[in-house]
């Protein structure tokens, strides 16, 4: 089977949520022609969909070595790094995606992700700046409003996370919040969700 047919099969399996099949076919495509980035990108997407961010990170990293000027691949690498909890690597990859002229549709997501990292690190000013840039590309959405409200609230209340272990992303609304508890419960006082 030729490379193009394998990639077509990968995309078909991926579209049908058959991620194991998609990954297997992507690996076959890589074995057929390891000089092309597309096989690695497909394998990375399948691995990410299977919940293996570390494996996805490996595939996307290799894809960036094959196609050094494709900003969209750097975005995918940054996304996998974010899922693996590598904040500093994430920012580097996302910045590289912007420098490499990634698609306009991706730029808003990049600024939104960087703002979340800024918020996790207690850098609310830069988080707000990045949220404004995200809004320029994707318009106003619910997540941007939530994140902006949290940043403004934390800035005005003087709540800065000095201990990163007490700062986490809320499991329900996906906004980064300091872990503030009431009377021993795990309910977050800022968003009202039980995290």
Where are these regions (language model features)?
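Single-residue signature of alpha-solenoid repeat helices
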Residues: 22, 56, 90, 127, ...
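Register position in tetratricopeptide repeats
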Residues: 15-16, 49-52, 83-84, 116-120, ...
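Helix-start (N-cap) detector for alpha-helical repeat units in TPR-like alpha-solenoids
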Residues: 2-4, 37-38, 71-72, 104-108, ...
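Canonical tetratricopeptide repeat
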Residues: 42, 76, 110-113, 147, ...
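Structural marker of alpha-solenoid helical repeat scaffolds
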Residues: 32, 66, 100-103, 137, ...
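Alpha-helical segment of the N-proximal tetratricopeptide repeat
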Residues: 2-38, 42, 48-49
């Amino acid at each position: 089977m030729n490379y193009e047919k394998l990639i077509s099969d990968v995309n078909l399996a991926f579209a049908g949520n058959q991620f194991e099949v998609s990954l297997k076919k992507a690996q076959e495509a890589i074995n057929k022609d390891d000089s092309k980035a597309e096989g690695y990108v497909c394998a990375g997407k399948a691995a990410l969909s299977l919940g293996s961010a570390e494996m996805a990170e490996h595939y996307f990293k290799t894809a960036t070595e094959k196609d050094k000027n494709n900003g969209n691949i750097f975005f995918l690498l940054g996304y996998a790094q974010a899922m693996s909890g590598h904040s500093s690597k994430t920012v580097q990859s996302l910045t590289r995606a912007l420098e490499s002229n990634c698609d306009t549709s991706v730029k808003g997501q990049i600024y939104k992700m960087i703002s979340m990292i800024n918020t996790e690190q207690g850098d609310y000013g830069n988080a707000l700046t990045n949220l404004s840039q995200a809004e320029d590309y994707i318009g106003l959405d619910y997540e941007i409003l939530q994140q902006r409200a949290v940043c403004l609230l934390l800035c005005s209340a003087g709540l800065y996370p000095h201990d990163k272990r007490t700062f986490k992303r809320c499991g329900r609304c996906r906004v980064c919040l300091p872990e503030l508890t009431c009377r021993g419960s795990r309910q977050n006082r800022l968003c009202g969700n039980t995290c």
